[in-house]
């Protein structure tokens, strides 16, 4: 800018010259010379850091404004800096008065609350703008109108933290604070348990320079995985080192830091640990203009002398520096809007306020600017920042090069912006719908996972080999194949370890877990790949992937032996009750037929049809004939008894219809009962087990099957659990192998998963599954609760399912040699063992008829005994003479001695065996004699009857 010059020669000083000089000084010089605006800064210093970062940012901003004349073309910004010790409020007040005496337009700093309150009271009394860039304890007195604070409001940050906790669905949170102000900053979160289902545990860090490892050890023991740290970035850097030392820098922990300088820390050691680390960022590095300023700052800092170790990246601009930079720019913008801004010297002891103070304060509060920390606007009432954004950032392993500067590239590489929190609209997570397919293996690639499992055929078995095997090569089976497929998809490595106690995982009465579930809870394992059932109680303490196999509980029992066919198995088609009812029906029908036949007149007939006037009538349906009619119909044989009356024919027809159905049903069932060897089992379902106590039953101790019966509310299963719990030493087994051996050797039924039963029955034909499935469940891959691997494992399992590999693996390990068919498709031929009883019945009938004939013989002999009581032998001969004859005749007898004696019978038999000629001659001679004898016997019997009559 060119400047006007006036030359005044000596001796020419006149009155006009004086007026010209006065005009130049009053009008020309102010328009042509730049205006100077002075601002003051009060900054604390420490012993090892003579110049703090806020002072450097203050100078950097003033220099940038003076170099870029577009903002203040006619004004030069100057500053006065005063340094004080920490927490020295008296020195801060004295230095503030010194700067006000110099005529500063605004005061910046200090940072700590005790000093800032003293300076703020002076500025408020003299009506000078006070600019703050640090968190300040909220003041109860609202009369402090002459200050603004660019640091986000504590209540807003507290709401942002609470929104994130709710978004992540954390049910248990640990808050670790550095000093008492942390409880004020997080009061919205601390009040959360009263409104939300969140448990909050509050802990305090030890004083400065104290070891925090005991606190971290206690947190690790208590399994506190979600931790919020409220501390400075220096403390955060030290805490992270101790967390790494304690082995708590794993993927199961999620740390959130409230400091806005988390992004500026050197976290290279923790990037590949898998830990979840989240924080806020106020710098708007997405803006190219902001990135360029950060690069300039970084270049200047790298050229400066090295600073003490603070854990920050070299040359990184902190949030404090960015806020101070923006604060200086806000004052510059306000001064640019003021046409004339003349600041006079102020004296603290006079209490005379600045004349331009209120106007300048309003200009600052009304200013709008997109600075390094985003859009800046103020609330005119309290001077606090409003409508601001907080970037939500998360630590990651690899990133994309999106920025041009080295510092910005590093920020994009280490941190990922996953959302934005706005003071008005709240939380907006922009990373919720990210493309998983492109980045699915980021956290698993080349990572070695500890896998816990249990020996269980065919899921995990020792590999058979002549050479010693080590590591994962020791094992084979379904779960090892599944692990291999998951590893191929996700790219991780794994180390398989057997669970020490050999149990799946159950909870005792004290709430303590064992088995593989405990391994996951204690984070001694990353995955549990085994036949681990997904249950409600386990889901509360660990996470599960989607099931890779579905199944249910069933009963393993010995195959029943085939029933040996009995000789009377032909009776099996009808139950004993039916046989009895059939016999009773036969007797009943016979009696009814006898009564009706006697009652109806149409069943009586004349035995002498040639003599129609005869008064003698007869009835064929005697009691014995009626019974014989019923038996003949039942046996499907004729009895030569014909009912004549309609009533008796109705009885006969109904009886025939009854016998038709009975015989048809018997015939239909006879084939099945005689040709098929029946397999009878004492139990057919869980209900059968529950109803008896002879067969002992149980499950694997501390397994999901045992837990199912223990927790079940169904009466049948409650009864079964009562049985098992009363006999725990004998009913519950240690593992499946022990249970299978008991099933084979004793009268024991094992309750286990259907897939395991399927495998066992394929290899042992003496075992079988009884009944259907008691429940329905699935096997899943277990992970510690909150594990980042669960979703990736689930996606990989679904991929294997769609490709059919899960089915192929099951076919590979379940397929056995197979067992022979239990039942032949063709009916077997009947043997003596099937129908031998029929021959026994026939023989018994023949023997019975012989004895009945003898009985009839004896009975008739007694009845027809002569009056003159002959001997036993003569009575026998008499009976034979009267009963055994060829045909009736009334001719005379040849004598008693010749009546069909034993010799006559033998003679007749001998004649029949001779030749034809001799047979005819002799038969005529002997036959005539015998025939005459028979007639004589008959005649004598007739005469005796008449005599007796």
UniProtKB/Swiss-Prot annotation:
Disulfide bonds join 765-819. It is found in: Cell membrane; Postsynaptic cell membrane. Keywords: Cell membrane, Disulfide bond, Glycoprotein, Ion channel, Ion transport, Ligand-gated ion channel, Membrane, Phosphoprotein, Postsynaptic cell membrane, Receptor, Signal, Synapse, Transmembrane, Transmembrane helix, Transport. The chain crosses the membrane at residues 577-597, 654-674, 835-855. One of its GO terms (cellular component) is neuronal cell body. It is a multi-pass membrane protein. One of its GO terms (biological process) is regulation of short-term neuronal synaptic plasticity. Its main location: membrane. GO terms for molecular function: extracellularly glutamate-gated ion channel activity; glutamate binding; glutamate-gated calcium ion channel activity; glutamate-gated receptor activity; identical protein binding; kainate selective glutamate receptor activity; L-glutamate transmembrane transporter activity; ligand-gated monoatomic ion channel activity involved in regulation of presynaptic membrane potential. Glycans are attached at residues 68, 74, 276, 379, 428, 439, 446, 561, 766. L-glutamate binds at residues 531, 533, 538, 704-705, 753. Expressed in the olfactory bulb (at protein level). Expressed in subsets of neurons throughout the developing and adult central and peripheral nervous systems. In the CNS principally in the medial amygdaloid nuclei, medial habenulae, pyriform and cingulate cortices, and Purkinje cell layer. Also highly expressed in embryonic and adult dorsal root ganglia. Expressed at high levels in the trigeminal ganglion neurons. The postsynaptic actions of Glu are mediated by a variety of receptors that are named according to their selective agonists. This receptor binds domoate > kainate > L-glutamate = quisqualate > CNQX = DNQX > AMPA > dihydrokainate > NMDA. Ionotropic glutamate receptor that functions as a cation-permeable ligand-gated ion channel, gated by L-glutamate and the glutamatergic agonist kainic acid. L-glutamate acts as an excitatory neurotransmitter at many synapses in the central nervous system. Binding of the excitatory neurotransmitter L-glutamate induces a conformation change, leading to the opening of the cation channel, and thereby converts the chemical signal to an electrical impulse. The receptor then desensitizes rapidly and enters a transient inactive state, characterized by the presence of bound agonist. Belongs to the glutamate-gated ion channel (TC 1.A.10.1) family. GRIK1 subfamily. PANTHER family: IONOTROPIC GLUTAMATE RECEPTOR. This is Glutamate receptor ionotropic, kainate 1. It comes from Rattus norvegicus. The lineage of its organism: Eukaryota, Metazoa, Chordata, Craniata, Vertebrata.
């Amino acid at each position: 800018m060119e400047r006007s010059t006036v030359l005044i020669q000596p001796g020419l000083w006149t009155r006009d010259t004086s007026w010209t000089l006065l005009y130049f000084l009053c009008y020309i010089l102010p328009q042509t010379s730049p205006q100077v605006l002075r601002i003051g800064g009060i900054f604390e210093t420490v012993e090892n850091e003579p110049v703090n970062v806020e002072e450097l940012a203050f100078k950097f901003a003033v220099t940038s404004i003076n170099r870029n004349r577009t903002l203040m073309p006619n004004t030069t910004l100057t500053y006065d800096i005063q340094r004080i010790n920490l927490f020295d409020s008296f020195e801060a007040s004295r230095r503030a008065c010194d700067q006000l005496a110099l005529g500063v337009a605004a005061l910046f700093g200090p940072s700590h609350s005790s000093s800032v309150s003293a300076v703020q009271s002076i500025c408020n009394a003299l009506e000078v703008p006070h600019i703050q860039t640090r968190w300040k304890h909220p003041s109860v007195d609202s009369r402090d109108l002459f200050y603004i604070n660019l640091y986000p409001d504590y209540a807003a940050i507290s709401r942002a933290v609470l929104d994130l906790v709710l978004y992540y669905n954390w049910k248990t949170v640990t808050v670790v604070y550095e000093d008492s102000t942390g409880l004020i900053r997080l009061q919205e979160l601390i009040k959360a348990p009263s409104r939300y289902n969140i448990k909050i545990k509050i802990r305090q860090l030890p004083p400065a320079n104290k070891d925090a490892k005991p606190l971290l050890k206690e947190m690790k023991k208590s399994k506190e995985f979600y931790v919020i740290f409220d501390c400075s970035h220096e403390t955060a850097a030290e805490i992270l080192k101790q967390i790494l030392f304690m082995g708590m820098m794993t993927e199961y922990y999620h740390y959130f830091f409230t400091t806005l300088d988390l992004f500026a820390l050197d976290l290279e050691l923790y990037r590949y640990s898998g830990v979840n680390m989240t924080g806020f960022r106020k710098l708007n590095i997405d803006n190219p203009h902001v990135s360029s300023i950060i690069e300039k700052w970084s270049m200047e800092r790298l050229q400066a002398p090295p600073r003490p170790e603070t854990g920050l990246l070299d040359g990184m601009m902190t949030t404090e520096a960015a806020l101070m930079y923006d604060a200086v720019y806000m004052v510059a913008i306000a001064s640019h809007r003021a046409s004339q801004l003349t600041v006079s010297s102020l004296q603290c002891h006079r209490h005379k306020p600045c004349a331009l103070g209120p106007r300048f304060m309003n200009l600052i509060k009304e200013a709008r600017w997109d600075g390094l920390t985003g859009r800046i606007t103020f609330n005119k009432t309290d001077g606090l920042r409003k409508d601001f954004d907080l970037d939500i950032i998360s630590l990651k392993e690899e990133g994309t090069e999106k920025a041009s500067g080295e510092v910005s590239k590093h920020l994009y590489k280490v941190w990922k912006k996953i959302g934005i929190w706005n003071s008005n609209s709240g939380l907006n997570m922009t990373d919720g719908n990210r493309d998983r397919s492109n980045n699915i293996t980021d956290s698993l690639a080349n990572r070695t996972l500890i896998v816990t499992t249990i020996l269980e055929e065919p899921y995990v078995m020792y590999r058979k080999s002549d050479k010693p095997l080590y590591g994962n090569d020791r094992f084979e089976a379904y779960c090892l194949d599944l692990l291999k497929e998951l590893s191929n998809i996700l790219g991780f490595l794994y180390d398989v370890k057997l669970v020490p106690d050999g149990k799946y995982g159950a909870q005792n009465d004290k709430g303590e877990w064992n088995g593989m579930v405990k391994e996951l809870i204690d984070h001694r394992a990353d995955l549990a790949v085994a036949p681990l059932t997904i249950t409600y109680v386990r889901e509360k303490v660990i996470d599960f992937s989607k099931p890779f196999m579905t199944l249910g509980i069933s009963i393993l029992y010995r195959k029943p032996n085939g029933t040996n066919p009995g000789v009377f198995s032909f009776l099996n088609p009808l139950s004993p009750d039916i046989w009895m009812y059939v016999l009773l029906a036969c007797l009943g029908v016979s009696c009814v037929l006898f009564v009706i036949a006697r009652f109806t007149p149409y069943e009586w007939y004349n035995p002498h049809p040639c003599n129609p006037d005869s008064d003698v009538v007869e009835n064929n349906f005697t009691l014995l004939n009626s019974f014989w009619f019923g038996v003949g119909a039942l046996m499907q044989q004729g009895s030569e008894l014909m009912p004549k009356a309609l009533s008796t024919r109705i009885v006969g027809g109904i009886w025939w219809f009854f016998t038709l159905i009975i015989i048809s049903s018997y015939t239909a069932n006879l084939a099945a009962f005689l040709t098929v060897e029946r397999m009878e089992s004492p139990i057919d379902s869980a209900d059968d087990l529950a109803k008896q106590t002879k067969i002992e039953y149980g499950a694997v101790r501390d397994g999901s099957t045992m837990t199912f019966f223990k927790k079940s509310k169904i009466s049948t299963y409650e009864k079964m659990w009562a049985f098992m719990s009363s006999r725990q030493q004998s009913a519950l087994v240690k593992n499946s192998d022990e249970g299978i051996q008991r099933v084979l050797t004793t009268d024991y039924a094992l309750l286990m998963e259907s897939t395991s039963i399927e495998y066992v029955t394929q290899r042992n034909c003496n075992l079988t599954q009884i009944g259907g499935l008691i429940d329905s469940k699935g096997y899943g891959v277990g992970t510690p609760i909150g594990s980042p691997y669960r979703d990736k494992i689930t996606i990989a399992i679904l991929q294997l399912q769609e490709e059919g590999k899960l089915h192929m693996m099951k076919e590979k390990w379940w397929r056995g040699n197979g067992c022979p068919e239990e039942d032949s498709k063709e009916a077997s031929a009947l043997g003596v063992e099937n129908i031998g009883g029929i021959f026994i019945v026939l023989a018994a009938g023949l023997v019975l008829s012989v004895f009945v004939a003898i009985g009839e013989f004896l009975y008739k002999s007694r009845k027809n005994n002569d009056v003159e009581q002959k001997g036993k032998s003569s009575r026998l001969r008499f009976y034979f003479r009267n009963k055994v004859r060829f045909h009736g005749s009334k001719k005379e007898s040849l004598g008693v001695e010749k009546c069909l004696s034993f010799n006559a019978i033998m003679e007749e038999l001998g004649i029949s065996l001779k030749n034809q000629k001799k047979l005819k001659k002799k038969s005529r001679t002997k036959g005539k004699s015998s025939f005459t004898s028979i007639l004589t016997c008959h005649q004598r019997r007739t005469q005796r009857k008449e005599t007796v009559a």
